[in-house]
Amino acid sequence: MIDSKLFTPASIGPLTLRNRTIRSAAFESMCPGNVPSQQLLDYHRSVAAGGVGMTTIAYAAVAQSGLSFDRQLWMRPEIVPGLKDITDAIHKEGAAAGIQLGDCGNMSHKSICGVTPVGASSGFNLYSPTFVRGLRKDELPAMAKAYGRSVNLAREAGFDAVEIHAGHGYLISQFLSPYTNHRKDEYGGSLENRMRFMDMVMEEVMQAAGSDMAVLVKMNMRDGFKGGMEIDETMQVAKRLVQDGAQALVLSGGFVSKAPMYVMRGEMPIKTMTHYMNCWWLKYGVRMAGKWMIPAVPFKEAYFLEDALKFRTEIKDIPLVYVGGLVSREKIDEVLNHGFEFVQMARALLNEPGFVNRMREEEKARCNCKHSNYCIARMYTIEMACHQHLREELPASLKKEIEKLEKK
């Protein structure tokens, strides 16, 4: 038997997990009408039953203006009972329950969130596509308080941990990055100024979390394109988050509106993506320009590890969570042996919810995810799913596209 930390318990703040695995907060797209569903419960229960230490419900908006999708959770009192059903189901399977809280900022559209999208600065977001209004200085305290209110709702719903989304080009990330923050006040310009909104959010979060909820923060190590944040700045962000009270950092990267495949790696199956789209003009536009809008970034297992190791060297005070392209027991053990306290997975557990249990039995266990990104291509319109487990037959043209990508 290899020397492995994988199935040893470890703690994040007040929370102890039964092992080192966490289902990452990959968007499920299972909440039509912005409310929890039986499908969401069934999926997270299956992952918990599959042996994971904690499973994380993804991308819950702290305000209506922060919604990117009409199948995304929106935190408000009326959804607490539905969320409580989910946390109860997760706990019965022996896993902890986490929820990711965030605000999409400019990554929305009036048809989804009901207002002109807001962000760190005014401009035009080609991703949506839509004009964006920069948040006024006097609006920022209320926006920060929305995070704190959402933490309190998460506690009522029985969650053990919250993960604050400060990466991937969403609202906090939009304030941090010089690419999206063009403000002339004390919230723009220098890195110190660009961190002010994050500090404000974390103050509200930590006050609401108190001593009984674990607080993780997902952050970028790099934005993934020229003109975005690089490690010299993000290392300072990580150190500030430690000062702000974060109890673990999830080390990621990428910017959904500018470098989406830097987050996920591989190639987006454009034909599949547009097949599921409802909006005719968006379907046509993505079909014509998708390869340019969503350029491929080569996939390799543990693709963020080289950068993450730099943070492991500098950040000693709190646990670091590695996320990014893990599909085998061998690579997971390697990452843990590098000193990371936890690992996160999403696509591996979508492909095989019981993967963690299988790893307990097999030292050479490897899931069957082939990195076609079919699950992500459909996620923008309908629920996230692995094409290997569909009940319906895929159209021949989509099968051909997926098979081609899986051979790369």
Could you describe each region identified by the protein language model?
Residues M1-K408:
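Flavin-dependent oxidoreductase catalytic cores
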